[in-house]
Amino acid sequence: MCDEDVAALVVDNGSGMCKAGFAGDDAPRAVFPSIVGRPRHQGVMVGMGQKDSYVGDEAQSKRGILTLKYPIEHGIVTNWDDMEKIWHHTFYNELRVAPEEHPVLLTEAPLNPKANREKMTQIMFETFNSPAMYVAIQAVLSLYASGRTTGIVFDTGDGVSHTVPIYEGYALPHAILRLDLAGRDLTDYLMKILTERGYSFTTTAEREIVRDIKEKLCYTALDFEQEMQTASSSSSLEKSYELPDGQVITIGNERFRCPETLFQPAFIGMESAGIHETTYNSIMKCDIDIRKDLYANTVLSGGTSMYPGIADRMQKEIQALAPPTMKIKIIAPPERKYSVWIGGSILASLSTFQQMWISKQEYDESGPSIVHRKCF
């Protein structure tokens, strides 16, 4: 079925960014925002070839006149028509391949609604005529990318965070925890606290500016209280940012108040545990004999784990929760923003994986529900 010479496609559809490329490559070929934009205004210049929707970078560059929508929220696809546009854009414009000629590996957050993967499967086979496909769990792929078979992965993207303990290659489903607190919530929170400084960001396009501020200037404080004191007594932590219109804004304690939400979700009114407690709780749900290995192999992955200082803070917080003599190691690979994709690239090019694909024939015989039987 799968010829050796046909490269599989690996598509990691995140809530914020879509990463796509070919299995066996060491980095994704295409990385673009998972955005579909529609014009807010009536077109007046006839013959300009205006489109009724724009995807990815093109939507981003024309954002001033568009309403931007993210079809994936909290890791779950909420708008399938837009999602189809994103996949179409991925195959035809970014990778320039015919999807009916390549097997496709897609990724998904754990504990997603079952209907979500079924619909993904259905669209791949019926709309794009894929010869074969597979849906893999994001965190498991990150562990592959770090070269381990045992560890606990804390994967945090734009829409959803989750901790997945894996022992000798087996995910432990009873101990998987999901946290609907991620990058997008931090962007929203930063929009809110910048309002206190007198800067108003309201539209979907302005939210993208705030996301950029967040990615460029925010960091995680090792000691939040101490950092707040430093910020109030001196201006050493202040940084300036130039807006697209040339106006310069100054941002101070917001730089670390924004990511602090990961450790104190109460900042945005969420009742859940912070990311350090969630990781700890996940480890505590595992068998007592394997906890030691999980503490020593805590892997961070995803774009929201890219804040400077987050690994040290995680180390400090988990050390405070764990038994005093426990060796704790937080692994934060520099390429962790793409580690899910890299893991997918590794998995899809393994010879042992080739019998795992769901083929078109199997789909035609069983329908979309086959995805639950063949994919973890």
From Swiss-Prot:
Lineage: Eukaryota, Metazoa, Echinodermata, Eleutherozoa, Asterozoa
CDD domains the UniProt entry points to: ASKHA_NBD_actin
GO cellular component, one term: cytoplasm
Major place of residence: cytoplasm
Natural source organism: Pisaster ochraceus (Ochre sea star)
Keyword Cytoplasm: yes
N-acetylaspartate: modified positions: D3
Pfam family, one: Actin
Keywords: Acetylation, ATP-binding, Cytoplasm, Cytoskeleton, Hydrolase, Muscle protein, Nucleotide-binding
InterPro entries noted in UniProt: Actin (IPR004000), Actin/actin-like_CS (IPR020902), Actin_CS (IPR004001), ATPase_NBD (IPR043129)
The reaction(s) this protein catalyses: ATP + H2O = ADP + phosphate + H(+)
General function of this protein: Actins are highly conserved proteins that are involved in various types of cell motility and are ubiquitously expressed in all eukaryotic cells.
Family (UniProt): Belongs to the actin family.
The protein's name in its UniProt record: Actin, muscle
